[in-house]
UniProtKB/Swiss-Prot annotation:
Keywords: Lyase, Signal. Activity is not affected by EDTA or 2,6-pyridinedicarboxylic acid (PDA). Activity is not affected by addition of most divalent metal ions, except zinc ions which decrease the activity. Inhibited by the iodide ion. This is Metal-independent carbonic anhydrase. It catalyses: hydrogencarbonate + H(+) = CO2 + H2O.
Length: 205
């Protein structure tokens, strides 16, 4: 039994030492009252992929500017140049690289109402696709101005949904109002991409 006494004493001493440290630490926190701070000698890395309202408004503005740019390019340089620009706009603004985009254009008709593919979106904007013979090119209608009036914006994490009116004016000054819903997703590079786009003409009784 004598062989175990030194080990017991060492264990007891270690326990007492640890307890003492714990007591000191607790006393230190207690003495500090409510003024408890956490510090670090290194800058803490933070990952924040939440979308801001300003990013949403900027993405909407960019869409409107792109539509006008396609129209003016068509008027000045023809369909080939307008189509090349439309392809760039779709690749830059929409999320087709992730998979199907929930795109329901204003003037699309059955059985090709929903344009879940890049090809379908391109056909709607600039036409010239035998798979979508009814498309004449919505973006080729000499649009000159786009005004966006949001009814509401719902932001949650890295997605944002908007609903409201978009007023598009052509070069003759004729304005067309559409009801529009967009949903944006912030990608791994911090860019907002459209993953839902529903557009329709206002109901008239």
């Amino acid at each position: 039994m004598n062989l175990f006494k030194p080990r017991i004493l060492v264990l007891f001493a270690a326990t007492a030492l640890i307890s003492g440290i714990a007591i000191v630490a607790q006393t230190s926190v207690a003495d500090s009252g409510d003024k408890i701070t956490a510090t670090s000698s290194l800058k803490t890395p933070i990952v924040n992929r939440a979308i801001t309202e300003s990013e949403v408004l900027a993405a909407q503005k960019a869409w409107g500017e792109a539509l006008v740019a396609i129209s003016t390019t068509y008027d000045a340089k023809g369909k080939a140049s307008a189509k090349a620009l439309a392809e760039k706009v779709i690749d830059d603004a929409y999320g087709y690289q992730f998979g199907p985009v929930l795109f329901k254009p204003t003037l699309a008709i059955s059985p090709r109402t929903f344009r879940t593919t890049r090809a379908g979106a391109l056909a709607y904007f600039v036409g010239d696709d035998k798979a979508f013979p009814e498309d004449k090119g919505f973006a080729l209608s000499s649009w000159r101005k786009v005004e966006i009036k949001n009814a509401a914006i719902f932001i949650t994490g890295n997605t944002a949904t908007t609903m409201g009116n978009v007023i598009i004016t052509d070069k003759q000054g004729k304005a067309t109002t559409v009801d529009k819903t967009w949903q944006f997703l912030k990608d791994d590079h911090g860019k907002l991409r459209i993953i839902t786009h529903h557009s329709s003409l206002p109901y008239e009784q």
